[in-house]
């Protein structure tokens, strides 16, 4: 039976007792499976957690083809195949990812609401996050207007509402874009702003501020796309508009 994924119900737990139920490999590296886990695997645009399982450093968390959650560990010898171990999540990394992910949804909704510009792709990274939106042309004042709208939502600290649904009822929610998952689906509502199928959102958005750097950086077309970057919390982004790609 696949691991019970406790992070869906509680994304703020940082320490727990993990029971090892299987030892194996993922992508050729040693890995363990836990009966229940709060470690978040790489999925839904959010990076995997880091931390520790017992004395072993957690290097990665991935979902296998069989839907089992594999915790890739750094081990130089045999791994104990059973037993309970103290587990700890790298909270600084996790919380940063949660902020980045929530901020991306709010900023994407701002582009769509104000400019009718859908998000074509998004990449969340350790240093910065990037969203790519479909716009043929834009000026700095327009970008500032989008940024101001997104920050207004953050400062108002609208209470998130969580909804659980499934494939049969997902159509009842006005999602900004179709979910990438199936089965049991978690939908997060930012009141009067956005509905998204998400992973681990933050409880409060008032401690988050979005800064954008903007410029055409066309990865799929000579001139039709632009990018906006969400920087780390509390940091302003000073950058120049890059030149058009050839």
How should these model regions be labeled?
Residues 1-246:
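A glycine- and charged-residue-rich anion-binding loop/surface
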């Amino acid at each position: 039976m696949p691991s019970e994924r406790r992070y869906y119900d509680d994304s703020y737990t940082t320490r727990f007792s993990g029971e090892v139920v299987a030892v194996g490999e993922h992508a050729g590296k040693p890995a363990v499976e836990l009966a229940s886990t709060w470690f978040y695997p790489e999925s839904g645009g959010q990076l995997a957690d880091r931390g520790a399982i017992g004395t072993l450093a957690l290097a990665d968390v991935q979902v296998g083809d069989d839907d089992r959650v594999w915790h890739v560990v750094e081990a130089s010898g045999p791994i104990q195949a059973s037993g309970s171990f103290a587990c700890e999540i790298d909270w600084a990394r996790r919380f940063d990812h949660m902020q980045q992910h929530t901020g991306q949804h709010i900023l994407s909704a701002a582009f769509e609401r104000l400019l009718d510009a859908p998000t074509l792709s998004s990449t969340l990274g350790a240093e910065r996050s990037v969203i790519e939106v479909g716009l043929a042309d834009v000026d700095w004042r327009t970008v500032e207007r989008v940024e101001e709208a997104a920050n207004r939502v953050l400062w108002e600290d609208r209470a998130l509402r969580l909804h659980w649904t499934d494939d049969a009822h997902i159509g009842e929610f006005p999602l900004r874009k179709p979910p990438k998952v199936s089965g049991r689906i978690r939908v997060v509502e930012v009141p009067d702003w956005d509905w998204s199928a998400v992973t681990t959102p933050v409880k409060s958005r008032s401690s988050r501020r979005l800064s954008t750097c903007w410029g055409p950086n066309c990865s799929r077309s000579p001139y039709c796309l632009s990018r906006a970057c969400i920087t780390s919390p509390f940091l302003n982004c000073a950058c120049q508009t890059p030149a058009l790609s050839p």
